[in-house]
Amino acid sequence: MYKLIAIDMDGTLLNDHHEVTEEVRDALHAAKAEGVKIVLCTGRPIGGVQRYLDELNLIEEGDYVIAYNGALVQNTHTNEVVSELSLGYDDLTSLYDLSLELKTPMHFFDSSNLYTPNRDISEFTVYESYVTQVPLHFRKIDEVPKDILIPKVMFIDKPENLSRVITSIPKDVREKYTMVRSAPFFYEILHSEASKGNAVRQLAQLLGIEQAEVMCIGDNGNDLTMIEWAGCGVAMANAIPEVLEAANFQTRSNNEHGVAHAIHELVLAK
């Protein structure tokens, strides 16, 4: 019996209209009623998750969320931070210099805001702010507080340009950080120990749940570590090839209530 289900949001929990369908909502409630811990595990900031936590009633005592691709693990009932891994100002300045060298826009977060140092604001930065409902600000790098804590920096660009950028990142920079492509136009840069897999593992240990009792559901590159670590890794039908290959089970797409199908097949039917 699975005791913890960690679920990615965009492309997994949510359909392409950024909605939780009734079928998915009912399956989550049924699993929770059976005592299964439901944890949203997303690249989004907390502000971009909260309305879904409220909608799904994942804000009760003992409920948790994993945000910023594993850089933050937080109790949603008390807001107590279980784990937080951040980049600092020196990381920001070096990554900004790299973005200029590679000719790619970038943006970054603090605990509650999204910032861009690019005066010509990228359409993908605007999209990120809109989808996550996080306030967007233009901020020159030399105006950023030196004590800032940054959950993640993102290089953003058209998919073909971003692919070129990714292959051009120097090896020493790659080795210094966790880097994941979370969407065709998003490349995320985090603390070296931050990943969805590490965050799910840490939370399972905190809750006394064995690896074999954990199911993880996802679709994109930032989900790969948790899909590989889980006792049962579930790939959406719309997942990238690497996730499909790593998964133990393939469910339907995010527009076909895939999360509900996986829960019915692997949890509620047992």
Curated annotation (Swiss-Prot):
Metal-binding in keyword set: yes
Signal peptide positions on this chain: none
InterPro entries for the chain: Cof (IPR000150), HAD-like_sf (IPR036412), HAD-SF_hydro_IIB (IPR006379), HAD_sf (IPR023214)
Cofactor: Mg(2+)
Keywords: Hydrolase, Magnesium, Metal-binding
Residues engaged in binding phosphate: M9, T42, G43, K196, N222
Gene Ontology CC: cytosol
MF (Gene Ontology): magnesium ion binding; phosphatase activity
Annotated Mg(2+) binding sites: D8, D10, D219
EC number: 3.1.3.-
Active-site residue numbers: D8
Family: Belongs to the HAD-like hydrolase superfamily. Cof family.
Protein name (Swiss-Prot/TrEMBL): Putative phosphatase YxeH
Organism: Bacillus subtilis (strain 168)
Taxonomy of the source species: Bacteria, Bacillati, Bacillota, Bacilli, Bacillales
Name of the gene: yxeH
